[in-house]
Structure formats: structure tokens, C-alpha cells
Amino acid sequence: MVKNKQLELVNAGWSMHDEACPIYEDMINNMKIGHDFVLKEFGIKPRIGWQIDPFGHSNYNARLFAELGFDAWFFARLDVFDKAKRSDEINLEYVHIPSTDYLGEDTRIFEHVLWNHYEAPPGFNWDMVQDDPGFITNTKDFYYNAP
């Protein structure tokens, strides 16, 4: 499934760093261990960063993920006032530029702040608790409900 691109492995660190590995060298080692494993076992290199619940991010996270070759980084936890402002302005997706003084353009990375931390947006939460109805896209089906 991974090789057929039916399943995407994201982040692929040994653990979700920043709370577990706050030192830059440890962040690098954490990602190296995970990426080496994924490359050996699946023959792929992850392209997406995913950090749903570390307690804070340093500016180095964006830099590290960009230098790892990630196309994007998805995360949930950020300053409550920053999140409110970005939500009001419909700006939860942006290009993060951690530093260009010494690093150049390669450190830019697309970032997406998750809508409501662990929850999917209304209508897209298909777990056992919320049980939103799935989309039936066949127009001939009695239960058709796609937008």
C-alpha cells in the first residue's frame, strides 16, 4: 500500500520531538532514527511533517522539516491568541520562513494548523463517538448525500 501510494507515512520520527527532544541535535537524531527505519522497511522518504500534540514548537522545527525535504507540516498546538487571529482571518495555512539570514530559501515550508486539535471539521468526523454520516457520492443511491 505504501509503494502504491495508497497509504502515506508522515513525520516518521522515532517519537514526536520538541517535548521529548528539545535540543536541536536530539531533534535531528530522533528524525534520523525514524527515517532510517522507514527507508529500510518501506523504501520511502516521508514528505509530510505531522505533530498533533507537542507542547510547543521551536523555530528550528520548521527549519528541520524543510531541510528534511518535507513539503508541508501539519500541527495542532500553537499560541491561543495566534490561533484565534489566524482562524478569524482564515489563515490557518501559510508558508513559514524560519530564517533566511544564513539558510536561504530552502528553509521555507508550507504549514497547516489543524482545525480543532484532535477533531475533524463538522461533517467529517466518522469515529464511533461523533458518527457523522459518510458521503455517498453515487447519485443513483437512495442515500446519496454528497455536496
Question: Model features per residue range: what roles?
Answer:
Residues 1-147:
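Catalytic-domain carbohydrate-binding cleft regions of carbohydrate-active enzymes
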